[in-house]
Amino acid sequence: MHPKIMVVDDEPDTIDLVKIILESENIQVIGASSGFECLELMELEKPDLILLDIMMPDMNGWETFHKIKERNPALPVAMLTVKSQEFDKMLGLHVLKADDYITKPFSRKELIKRTRDLLGTKAG
């Protein structure tokens, strides 16, 4: 069975780009355009990994991250964001304990490698 990831981003182009890249690697991609949609779809779709934007209207990525972890502490969540300052990375990785912190723009190779690393043995 192919691994399934959810991309949560209010920019449809980002979801489409991730989908094109990862589906070429036999990784199923579900898009969600908000934190609220992510939380709804999470129960239904049961993703193996969530790639989560930080800057979104209504519920930002940090709030969404906390709600995801409350519901499913073992589910890997990587931040996928334009916020590339060292402070933001430290906050994401060391304070909030995100599983990874991927900054936009990312390369195809980087996204595939980091997604596979996060999925562990499920990818391939």
Label each region the model flagged.
Residues 63, 84-100:
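Alpha4 helix (beta4-alpha4-beta5 surface) of REC/receiver domains from two-component response regulators
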Residues 26-33, 41:
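Short hydrophobic/Thr-rich beta-strand motif most characteristic of the beta2 strand and flanking loop
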Residues 56:
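Receiver (REC) domain active-site loop signature in two-component systems and cognate sites
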Residues 105-116, 123:
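C-terminal output helix
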